[in-house]
Amino acid sequence: MGQIVTFFQEVPHIIEEVMNIVLITLSLLAILKGIYNVMTCGLIGLLTFLFLCGKSCSTIYKDNYRLMQLNLDMSGLNATMPLSCSKNNSHHYIQVFNTTGLELTLTNDSLIGHKWCNLSDAHKKDTYDHTLMSIISTFHLSIPNFNHYEAMACDFNGGKISIQYNLSHSSETDAMNHCGTVANGVLEVFRRMTWCTHCDTPLGASIAGFNCVRTSYKYLIIQNTTWEDHCTMSRPSPMGYLSLLSQRAREIYISRRLMGTFTWTLSDSEGNDLPGGYCLQRWMLIEAEMKCFGNTAVAKCNQQHDEEFCDMLRLFDFNKEAIHRLRVEAEKSISLINKAVNSLINDQLIMRNHLRDIMGIPYCNYSRFWYLNDTRSGRTSLPKCWMVSNGSYLNETHFSSDIEQEANNMITEMLRKEYERRQGTTPLGLVDLFVFSTSFYLISVFLHLIKIPTHRHLVGKPCPKPHRLNHMGVCSCGLYKQPGLPTKWKR
């Protein structure tokens, strides 16, 4: 009995302790909620902006996505395809392997005095480099409607290669008069290589589908040369030469069959083949470590071939597979890339960038790419080309809307994958049970609101329970025995 009395004496103290705990808990909740409200009301963001405006730039978009970039080093591709670059605005080069190449010079000084080109005699003597000659043939065959042989002169004595194209388009009138000739075609091909910065189309002049190109140079001279460090103005890239090949529709049927030889191989972080992403190794990048992209990003290249970065991945893959499987020589490698180009790269993308360059719109030079990195999960987007305008890369602010859209796409993709994951891990029976229980609850709420009556009352009389009256107001027990009294339903 004494223990019971003692317990009840301690009850007020226990209640006081409980009240203290409740007050502490409520205080903590109020403080945390207040801090959250202050953080999300925009005050701190406004103060941060006012403090950093004009001083600092952020590379974080949508709070979690960091803007990253990579620069591709395409010098390793010279094992299987020609690379082109520029020393200045007038001297341009095509590299074949590491030992030889071609020099293409826009000049006002003539190198060859005669006006003829005896190709048949050169073929009989067979003294020139066949690899270099195949590149020249590609360049020459890319000239639209070549039928003006007087505009071309050649010299193959002693195994050297010297070809001179005469240009006479220094004025707008000359450009219009010679529109569609071989000289104009040479300039058009040169522009397709994204080289001729001193070539322009006056007032958008065009006749019969040909752009009338104007230049201040009189000659284009092509010569073989030893390979040195010529690329001082631009980095070596295969895209100029491949842009010529992509215009040759007659190669398409041959090239489509070649893709069975090569597979879309993916590599893990150690370089081992693994179908779970693609890693750009150090030799593929400029001043950067290995960069890996997940299956989500790379899979888009297999689904739709409409990104410049996908073209570069295919070129790297082609280069690796050609060296590993075929061990091709120089001349054979040129022939191979000539046939495979339409299966590796999207010629519509190349033409679109070429037209952008002509019209002065920012275009892609296939060298620098940007992508978004999710700081929470480490996932990356598929890199997109960093556009070039007037010889320099655009500032980030010029394509901030594209960055925002890519961040939104990544958020949408994340939500979709999360939904699919949850759908795959949740048993179907459990989902059915949830739907049934929810429906049952809603029906029960409706039934509760309408208050269904349960028994009869005599009008003006108290509740007859436990007696159950029939429609005549009579109960069989005999207590309610007067029939005909008015009744009503009650709950």
UniProtKB/Swiss-Prot annotation:
Site feature location: Cleavage = S58, T59, M259, G260
Q: For this protein, what is any one GO molecular function term?
A: metal ion binding
Origin superkingdom: Viruses
Where a lipid (N-myristoyl glycine) is covalently attached, the residues are: G2
Topological domain (Extracellular) residues are: 2-17, 59-432
Q: Which InterPro entries match?
A: Arena_glycoprot (IPR001535), Arena_glycoprot_zinc-bd (IPR043015)
Cytoplasmic compartment spans:
34-58, 454-491
Residues modified by glycosylation: N78, N88, N98, N108, N118, N166, N224, N365, N373, N390, N395
- Please give the GO cellular component terms listed in this UniProt entry: host cell endoplasmic reticulum membrane; host cell Golgi membrane; host cell plasma membrane; membrane; viral envelope; virion membrane
Give one Pfam hit by family name.
Arena_glycoprot
Give residue numbers for the site Important for GP-C-mediated membrane fusion. Answer: K33
Q: Which residues cross the membrane?
A: 18-33, 433-453
Task: Detail the disulphide connectivity of this chain as listed in its UniProt entry.
Answer: C85-C231, C117-C154, C179-C212, C279-C292, C301-C310, C364-C385
Which parts of the sequence bind Zn(2+) 1? C57, H467, C475, C477
What processes in GO biological process is this protein linked to?
fusion of virus membrane with host endosome membrane; receptor-mediated endocytosis of virus by host cell; virion attachment to host cell
Give the family from UniProt: Belongs to the arenaviridae GPC protein family.
Q: What is this protein called?
A: Pre-glycoprotein polyprotein GP complex
What is the organism of origin for this protein?
Mobala mammarenavirus (isolate Rat/Central African Republic/Acar 3080/1983) (MOBV)
